[in-house]
Each structure stands twice: as structure tokens, then as C-alpha cells.
């Protein structure tokens, strides 16, 4: 039902920078229902308040709504979707780990540089949790990425489209258990 799908989707968009301070009432991370280990990592990274895009998106994404976000580079969009993924995995642990190469979340990024940055941000948030992130991108050693992918269960797979196709063609990745899809810079 198209109407039901529309009810489960939210659009979070930042306004012009000069207007943000006039209308945005900052949300503190501690006000959100985040797992304590994740909140500790956010605090250690030096963050107390959500950016405007995070403050608008997180209340919905943490409540299991689909969210489309648009904001300038460097405004915290990556942290918003990673915080959502980490929280989801904490609140919904798997009873049985999936087969190797079967991620719970897929994050598609258009470039190697962005994919590697997303992986680095995920590692920063993962200080006190056990969320396994693997990054597969073109222009880097395929066999090394394959070994990393098949080393153990994957929670978050960050990939560029071309390299994802390479792994799908070889049947090293199974997207059948993906719970969350993030398309960054769509």
C-alpha cells in the first residue's frame, strides 16, 4: 500500500546555515535512547549535542522510520546513520550469527574515499561495542578485502557499487539478510 509506505518514511533536511540557529533547538545525545556503550563512545569523541541534521533525523530513524537526509558536507549525516545502525544492532541482537559474507546493513558510497571515511567513523563509534564493519572498494587489494570479509560475520558492509558487484558475482556476499540500506550521496 503506497499510503502505508509513505507513513513509514521521513525526510530530514537542513535549512540554509544562517537560519539553522534561529529555528533549531539542539538535542543532546544523552536525551536520545542510545545504548550506554555507544553514548560513551560519542562522549569520548567529544560530542555532546546533535548537529541539526542529526537532531532532525535521529528521533525518526531510531524509531524505525526510513529517513532521507540532505545537508552540507561535514554536518554529521554519516554519524546519524551509523548511530542508528549501532543502536538497532544493540537492541536487536541476532540469536544466531549469519553465514560469512552476509551483512545486516549495507552502506553504498560512490567513491573509495567516502567509503573509507565511513568505515573510519564506524570504528570510532565502535569503541565499546562489538559491531563488525568491513569496507570493500575498488582500487585496493581484492584478495585482502575478501579475506577480511570472510574472516567472520559482518554487521555493516560499506561498499562502492563496482566492488560490491565484483563480490556478488563471486558469491562472496549474500544480501539476503540485509535489514538496513544506506545510500550515501545518492
Report each predicted region and the residues it spans.
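SF2 DExD/H RNA helicase N-terminal ATP-binding lobe
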Residues: 2-4, 15-186
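Eukaryotic nuclear low-complexity, Arg/Ser/Gly/Pro-rich intrinsically disordered regions
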Residues: 8-10
Amino acid at each position: 500500500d503506497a499510503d502505508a509506505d509513505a507513513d513509514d518514511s521521513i525526510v530530514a533536511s537542513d535549512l540554509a546555515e544562517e537560519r539553522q540557529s534561529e529555528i533549531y533547538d539542539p538535542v543532546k545525545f544523552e536525551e536520545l535512547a542510545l545504548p550506554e556503550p555507544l553514548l560513551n563512545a560519542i562522549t569520548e569523541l567529544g560530542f555532546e549535542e546533535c548537529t541539526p541534521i542529526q537532531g532532525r533525523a535521529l528521533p525518526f530513524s531510531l524509531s524505525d522510520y526510513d529517513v532521507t537526509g540532505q545537508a552540507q558536507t561535514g554536518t554529521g549525516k554519516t554519524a546519524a546513520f551509523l548511530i542508528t545502525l549501532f543502536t538497532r544492532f544493540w537492541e536487536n541482537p541476532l540469536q544466531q550469527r549469519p553465514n560469512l559474507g552476509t551483512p545486516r546493513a549495507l552502506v553504498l558510497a560512490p567513491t573509495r574515499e567516502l567509503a573509507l571515511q565511513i568505515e573510519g567513523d564506524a570504528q570510532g563509534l565502535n569503541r565499546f561495542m562489538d559491531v563488525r564493519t568491513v569496507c570493500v572498494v575498488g582500487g585496493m587489494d581484492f584478495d585482502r578485502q575478501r579475506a577480511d570479509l570472510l574472516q567472520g560475520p559482518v554487521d555493516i558492509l560499506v561498499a562502492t557499487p563496482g566492488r560490491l558487484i565484483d563480490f556478488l558475482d563471486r558469491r562472496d556476499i549474500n544480501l539476503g539478510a540485509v535489514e538496513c540500506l544506506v545510500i550515501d550521496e545518492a
